[in-house]
Amino acid sequence: MVSEGFTKILLCSFCVGIALSANVSKSKAKFDNYKVLRVQIQDEKAQNYIANPDHEALYNVWAEPRINYTADIMVAPEKLKEITSGLSSNGLEYSTMIEDVQTLIELESTPITTEKDRSAGHPMTWTEYHSQEDMEAYMDYLVERYPDLVSIDDIGTSYEGRAMRVLKICKGGTCGQKPAMWIDGGIHAREWASPAVATFHMKELVENSKNYPSNLLDKLDWYILPVHNPDGYEYSRTDNRMWRKNRYFQNSYTKHQ
């Protein structure tokens, strides 16, 4: 069954994400004494309070507010008193989930890749986080080695001019004749595990397809965009580990995202 094979890939990719998420480098922006508060969202009033766009300058939302769940917000030390006072005055219960964000970042040990080891014909591994350049090199490698199965579509460029490339995996070399599966990663810049999982799907579907039911390629075309937000992703690697959005600015808005 297709679902059985896809589940197998998802389980493998989940393991990749878990392994990598414990291995993140330090970055230039510092978050000393930033705290993450976990807020109880009991009703629509609480949900609207946390989601209020006027509060964007006060805190950074890590987990979106949903009624009967919790929301996580990162707060700068100079804003903490104002935020906790506002939460209390509006009847919102909260607790401190992370005491110091910078300490958490520094506990993550393995660096992102800087050297290009191409002994395998490409620079990719799935034990470290890679640049968009490395991922594109891997995509080119797959096209060169598996031309009857793999091709690339350039679907546009980012605000800063980076390519947005989709890997197409279509058995027989012709896409569009079968139902399609779409996978993308890196919509939120700081979530590095998702591009790693997207490229892991590439590897498993193309290089290790014999390990899965043939239906995955016989019955489906696959389209994989590893980095949906390349500008933000690279910025989170080089400057600000907590950056979430893209790099398009309006009205000189430059706060932590």
Q: Which residue ranges define each predicted feature?
A:
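Structured segments of extracytoplasmic/periplasmic soluble domains
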Residues: G86, N90, Y138-R145, H201-N208, ...
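Intrinsic-disorder/low-complexity accessory segments
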Residues: A22-M135, L220
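Structural signal for hydrophobic/aromatic residues that build the beta-strand cores
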Residues: M1, I83, G161, V166, ...
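Cleavable N-terminal signal peptides of Sec/SRP-targeted secreted and luminal proteins
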Residues: S3-S21
